[in-house]
Amino acid sequence: MAMNHQGMHSGHHDYTPLLIAFLAVAGGVLLGMIAAIGNPILLIGTIALFAMAILAFAPRLLFWAVLAGGLVVAGLIRLYLPQLQAFRWLVAAGAIALPFMLAFHAMFSHRQGESTSFPSFLIWAAAFVAYSALSAFILSHGWASAILGLKDYFQVWGLLPAFLLLPARPDFRKTLLTLVLAIGVIQVPFALHQYFFLAPLRAGIPSVMPADIVAGTFGGDMNGGGNNAAMAAYQFFCIAIVLGLWKNGLLGVRRMLALTACLAVPVFLNETKVSFVFAVLVFVVVYWNEIRQNPLRFIQAGVIFVAILATFVMFYVFVAENTDRIHGLDQYLDLLVEHNLFRGYGTYQLNRATTLTFWFSEHVPRDLFHALVGHGLTQTREASAFVDIGTTLAARRYAGMGIGVTALSGLLWEVGLIGAGLVIALFVSAFRLAGKLARECRDEPIRQAFIKGTQAGIAVTVLSLAHKSLFMFEVTYQVFVILLLGYLAYEFKQFRSAETRQPAVIG
């Protein structure tokens, strides 16, 4: 009887397979016609659009496609197929459409027992989105500028509510963890190719560091910069997870060392100096409880950790000596200090430190209004294919200065102390929530290791705000950031679903 009852579903029919079949047939006919024309870009574009249409009926598949597309495909297209860069926008289009598709499916799925709670860091996120939109149009420098600014800031933020709208499945966490670590591992072959084959081709380009192109799947420009720091941040996120799995007894020493070494190879190759600080942050966050409870054991582990850092330093010194940039460790350390505190970054007059002091001197006390609210989105941009950069603050008043050389300085100039404060509050709230969730799942070692690794990833992201400007426009890095925040939101929802069905806002 139970089987018969389940078989009769109130006359409900699922037409999704028929719709997908129709789209596939229609797409095949259209693709045949376009192939006859012989335009490869038009052909690829049509394939991508039909793939998006089919994925509309499979939002879970679209979710994984956006994650993998943002962390792998988008960066590779930018570096290896720059003529197809427009297709990177498909990641943004998928991220925007995804929450609407999931919400639509949720309306007809009749889910039971799922919490409607949401973490408090989402309030800070929503406040930043609302404030940025308000700033874009009140401090408007034209509709195109406002729309471009909002697109650059929030092009993949649709992934954040998507994590909350995903229906709970027991295999989701394992699948996500597998994907995260797999993407970390596949950075290795790409980094090796970029180091041995692409970096030497950049040796003669003025004001360009050859090793910056070693960015794995996070992309770069053969004639400009690369997202090597973004790849380093992602690799340390993966390393933090591996350390957590080892600490919780899920990995043996040999496997832990092998995985850590594999994940660290791209970081060694791309010479990202901030990796030293990333490593310290990861170590402290993952082992914070042990540091507080057993300082002596921490000192012992710290000796090993310092030895690893020393290996990093000596490798970088060796590479620099062989490229005739410096001679000896002392000169290398002097170069680091000069590069970050005294000399301009690249071709700019300002560097990561002086861009902040310059912002302060330009606003306090003579322009407190713009210090609070900023000058408007895109005002630190010095190049764009869609907006007349001659009207931006960076091009009009501060040409060649580099006022947006980091995300922190860029946020201060564009959305002021209010906007920058909302971003900091967002990450602080998420960091604290990760700590609480990790304490709540002591009996679930895989879950705790993943959450603790995410907490370390958030710490790395906060530091990155003062190191690079990627947070404000780079789709690959933004997918990584939203992955961290979205996973925390998902875990929060799972905890609340296990406790209560009543709406709540905590965290």
Regions found by a protein language model. Give the residues of each.
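Transmembrane alpha-helices of multi-pass inner-membrane enzymes
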Residues: 24-28, 238-243, 427, 452-507
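N-terminal signal-anchor transmembrane segment
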Residues: 11-107, 134-135
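A membrane-periplasm/extracellular boundary helix in multi-pass inner-membrane enzymes
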Residues: 195-198, 270, 287-344, 364-366
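Loop-to-helix entry and N-terminal half of a specific, functionally important transmembrane alpha helix
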Residues: 258, 402, 413, 424, ...
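Interfacial loop-to-transmembrane-helix boundary motif in multi-pass membrane proteins
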Residues: 63, 113-129, 151, 163-192
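Long extracytoplasmic/lumenal interhelical loops at the membrane interface
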Residues: 201, 346-415, 434-442
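Aromatic-anchored transmembrane helix interface
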Residues: 88-100, 120-133, 142-166, 184
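Alpha-helical transmembrane segments of multi-pass inner-membrane proteins
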Residues: 51, 133, 174-204, 222-290
